[in-house]
């Protein structure tokens, strides 16, 4: 067996989501996913992980996607639910794209700077060969190639601008920077903002070739691009 979701179901999802975005749907979008369906094939040896970053970089992206395919094949999609996967490399993975170290344990991922630099010493640039950026693209490309539009592949959690900056200036330092160097914080934030869009566009260039539409870390479907504004850092200001 394969993933149980027909083109007709997809069309229904698209129509209901479009009406919801326009404020024309007289109910909330309700997604129900029930496990227990027979996947019709043996379970892959690759384990299931909540964080895609938990998989060793030596594991081919195609094997990660095969694990996802198996898991999706066990699900009954009800209501407004649809098959969707989220390449989860940690909240604010742009920090890793820009040079932070990505750390992992058995529960989560986080980012640390490789050097303790002052705000004025930070330099951000787009690096197409960054190991984590390449991994995200490889996984997304493998997913798109495997499913050819049957499964919605979400945008990874790029993060909020100040959240990304706080990975380079661990939060207590960035709090002081807001007082001591507010203009420098703004300047660095706009630099990250520009790069954020570069990363979004680069990943989207892969996803939009076959994806039914757009989702992010929330599986809310949209025919047009969207992403949530977010700033976890702001609660400490």
What are these regions (language model features)?
Residues 84-122:
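A contiguous, low-structure linker/loop signature
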Residues 1-50, 66, 71, 78-86, ...:
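Active-site loop segments of alpha/beta catalytic cores
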Residues 53-62:
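Trp/Phe/Arg-rich N-terminal binding region typifying the photolyase-homology
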Residues 49, 53, 112-120, 237:
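Short, solvent-exposed coil/turn linker segments
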């Amino acid at each position: 067996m394969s993933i149980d979701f027909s083109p007709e179901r997809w069309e229904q999802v698209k129509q209901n989501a479009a009406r919801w975005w326009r404020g024309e749907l007289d109910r909330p979008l309700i997604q129900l996913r029930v496990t227990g369906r027979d996947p019709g094939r043996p379970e892959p040896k690759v384990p299931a992980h909540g964080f895609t970053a938990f998989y060793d970089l030596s594991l081919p992206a195609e094997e990660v996607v095969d694990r996802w395919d198996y898991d999706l094949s066990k699900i009954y999609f009800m209501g407004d639910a649809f098959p969707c996967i989220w390449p989860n490399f940690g909240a604010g993975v742009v920090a890793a794209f820009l040079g932070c170290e990505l750390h992992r344990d058995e529960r989560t991922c986080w980012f640390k700077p490789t050097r303790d630099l002052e705000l004025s010493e930070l330099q951000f640039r787009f690096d197409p060969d960054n190991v984590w950026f390449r991994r995200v693209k490889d996984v997304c490309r493998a997913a798109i190639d495997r499913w050819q539009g049957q499964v919605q592949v979400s945008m990874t959690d790029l993060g909020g601008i100040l959240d990304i900056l706080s990975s380079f200036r661990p939060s207590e330092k960035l709090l002081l920077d807001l007082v001591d160097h507010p203009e420098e914080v703004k300047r660095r934030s706009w630099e990250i903002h520009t790069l954020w869009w570069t990363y979004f566009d680069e990943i989207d260039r892969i996803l939009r070739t076959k994806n039914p539409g757009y989702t992010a870390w929330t599986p809310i479907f949209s025919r047009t691009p969207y992403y949530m504004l977010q700033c976890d850092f702001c609660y400490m200001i």
